[in-house]
Amino acid sequence: MTQQLTAVVPAAGIGSRMAADRPKQYLHIAGKTILEHTIDRLFSHPAITRVIIAISQTDPYFASLPLANDPRITVVDGGAERADSVFAGLAAIDDENTWVLVHDAARPCVRLNDLERLVEAAIRSDSGAILAAPVRDTMKRGCQQINGLQGIVSTVDRNNLWHALTPQMFKVKQLKDSLQHALKEGAVITDEASALEYCGYIPQLVKGRSDNLKVTQPEDLALAGFYLEQLMKE
């Protein structure tokens, strides 16, 4: 593949569930911040030549990172919601007919072979593609009971259920238009693919590794550190 690709990384969130003294993307594991590892993994794909990072306007951490001086990095002001930050990143891309990958700032363990398969699948598709992992556990649908505890309503058939991962890859204009339309109509948009789904597109599912975890809870840090150490040995 000779086409150059851009990635957008929304990194304006505060990560309150981590209960840390700083946003989770700036926590250190395996010698670097999570954000630095995430960007390193994206640049492991030779076609990804630019990464746009959307950060909070009051972010006091990014400027001290080596990333701040990397010519391949573009920084834009993020917004209150993920979609706002993604929009800001998309606005910095001049060619709306090109492809863009959107990747979570706190997902530092994505592997090169997953990136390669995602890019190949997206370019073959009219509706883009996402990395995803099949659901393996038994899934329960719950409801809140009078005592405040959660009760089981039913067991959900896990056939054809997938965990949506990132990166997610789409044409820039297609993603922009889908996000705008879905949000204007009040649709619940939890990831980029959900905006395209709302607009009638069928993005492709590309089976990815389950160790491409998103650091969300404190216990995720040790696991992400272990996975990164394995990556560094390869």
From Swiss-Prot:
It catalyses: 2-C-methyl-D-erythritol 4-phosphate + CTP + H(+) = 4-CDP-2-C-methyl-D-erythritol + diphosphate. The record marks R17, K24 as: Transition state stabilizer. It comes from the Bacteria. Its EC number is 2.7.7.60. Pathway: Isoprenoid biosynthesis; isopentenyl diphosphate biosynthesis via DXP pathway; isopentenyl diphosphate from 1-deoxy-D-xylulose 5-phosphate: step 2/6. CDD domains: CDP-ME_synthetase (cd02516). The record marks R158, K214 as: Positions MEP for the nucleophilic attack. InterPro entries: IspD, IspD/TarI, IspD/TarI_cytidylyltransf_bact, ISPD_synthase_CS, Nucleotide-diphossugar_trans. GO terms for biological process: isopentenyl diphosphate biosynthetic process, methylerythritol 4-phosphate pathway. GO terms for molecular function: 2-C-methyl-D-erythritol 4-phosphate cytidylyltransferase activity. Keywords: Isoprene biosynthesis, Nucleotidyltransferase, Transferase. SUPFAM superfamilies: Nucleotide-diphospho-sugar transferases. Pfam families: IspD. Belongs to the IspD/TarI cytidylyltransferase family. IspD subfamily. Catalyzes the formation of 4-diphosphocytidyl-2-C-methyl-D-erythritol from CTP and 2-C-methyl-D-erythritol 4-phosphate (MEP). This is 2-C-methyl-D-erythritol 4-phosphate cytidylyltransferase. It comes from Photobacterium profundum (strain SS9).
